[in-house]
Amino acid sequence: GFGFFSNNKNNVRYPHIGIVIIGNNVEIGCNNIIDRGSMSNTIIDNNTYLDNQVHVAHNVKIGKNCIIAGQVGFAGSTTIGNNVMIGGQAGISGHLNIGDNVKIGGGSGVIDDISKNDKVMGYPAKNIKKFIKNNQ
């Protein structure tokens, strides 16, 4: 994982002691990066599919039955619920909670938590109905 702090003279790397846990029936595409956890574990739960070029940062937890399209990036310590679908090239900021059954449109930038069953898109990502209304 990517973990540094500055001591005013130089940058110092702190060790990551967590592990990566990959559940059953998980598919991981080509050129993915999955960082080990810093103080806790990085987890990809059962029946989740990662397309190519997905980055999963330290301490991320991805739930069951998720489908993640190519070039999605998860910043550290974000929790993704079960049955979540994320379109290609979406970016998910760190320390967020994404609820169960959420759908995130491709190219979206998620900078806030998303409640369960919501559908979002855009940057910043917002409810799809609000996005369409504001972008006509």
Give the residues covered by each predicted segment.
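Structural signal for interior beta-strand "rungs" in well-ordered beta-sheet cores
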Residues: G1-N127
